[in-house]
């Protein structure tokens, strides 16, 4: 069986085709081999979407899955289901992603946020394999959080927007915050643009600055501790450009344990 996948991002669209092997007979054990992949810059929708559709045309895919930057409408009964909604990327507001590819390709289209797609991948094949509840956090240009809870992706009033979790400030932080909606949310204080604006240099040029990463770990750990208390995940996966600073992992883990104060303890 041949399937298609799209990682729809604010700067690039990654489109891929995969072959699904089902020899083992168990749905959770299916393996997908990527046979073709292309990266398309995210320009205006009228330029980008036809290029994406053209990649899949004539390839014989039976279905397509889209993990998309947001916010997006995930309510199937909504007239705007499958749309990108109030994104800061003005040209992409109210763009019908599901409808566009359904019409172009004539196959079923699955649709969710990019981070929910990522956490689904982690529980299916990756670091959170076989977990009933897991969280995926990407820390880069923004902060996104995907939640897989009791065997299903979490939806509700909207999809999880836990990247905008409100935080207490680090006692030495005088930076106002990057988020235009919430001065002291996780994205506003810990995203890549926030790090650069606070310290005057991009994160990749600050690797040797202990004070930078102590403050970053403070904010990430504060959020992670709250996610542990709220969602009770068996695994939390951290990724994104900021997490290329590998020293952060141990710093965040130590700070999370400190914040939880022994109330919840798990060696993993």
PLM ranges: what are they?
Residues 109-113:
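General beta-strand structural signal in soluble alpha/beta enzymes
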Residues 78-92:
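A charged helix-plus-loop insertion that forms the helical arch/lid used to bind
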Residues 1-64, 72-80, 99-107, 124-133, ...:
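ATP-binding/phosphotransfer module of carbohydrate and carboxylate kinases, centering on a glycine-rich
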Residues 7, 114, 140:
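Active-site glycine-centered loops adjacent to acidic/histidine catalytic or metal-binding residues
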Residues 135-137:
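Acidic, His- and aromatic-enriched active-site or binding-groove loops in soluble protein domains
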Residues 143-145:
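Active-site histidine-anchored catalytic micro-motif
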Residues 154-170:
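A conserved active-site-flanking secondary-structure segment within enzyme catalytic domains
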């Amino acid at each position: 069986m041949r399937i298609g996948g799209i990682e729809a991002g604010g700067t690039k669209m990654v489109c891929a085709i995969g072959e699904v092997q089902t020899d083992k007979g168990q749905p959770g054990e299916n393996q997908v081999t990527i046979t073709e992949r292309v990266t398309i810059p995210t320009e205006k929708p009228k330029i980008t979407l036809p290029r994406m559709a053209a990649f899949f045309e004539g390839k014989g895919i039976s279905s397509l899955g889209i993990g998309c930057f947001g916010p997006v409408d995930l309510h199937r009964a909504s007239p705007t289901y499958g749309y990108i909604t109030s994104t800061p990327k003005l040209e992409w507001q109210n763009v019908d992603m599901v409808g566009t590819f359904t019409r172009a390709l004539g196959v079923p289209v699955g649709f969710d946020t990019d981070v929910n797609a990522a956490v689904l991948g982690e529980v299916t094949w990756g670091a959170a394999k076989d977990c009933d509840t897991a969280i995926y956090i990407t820390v880069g240009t923004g902060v996104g959080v995907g939640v897989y809870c009791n065997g299903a992706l979490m939806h509700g009033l909207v999809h999880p927007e836990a990247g905008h979790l409100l935080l207490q400030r680090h006692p030495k932080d005088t930076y106002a915050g990057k988020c235009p909606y919430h001065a002291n949310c996780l994205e506003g204080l810990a995203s890549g643009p926030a790090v650069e604006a606070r310290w005057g240099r991009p994160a990749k040029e600050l690797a040797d600055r202990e004070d930078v990463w102590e403050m970053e770990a403070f904010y990430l750990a504060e959020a992670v501790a709250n996610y542990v208390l709220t969602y009770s995940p068996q695994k939390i996966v951290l990724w994104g450009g900021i997490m290329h600073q590998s020293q952060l992992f141990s710093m965040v883990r130590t700070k999370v344990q400190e914040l939880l104060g022994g109330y919840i303890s798990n060696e993993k």
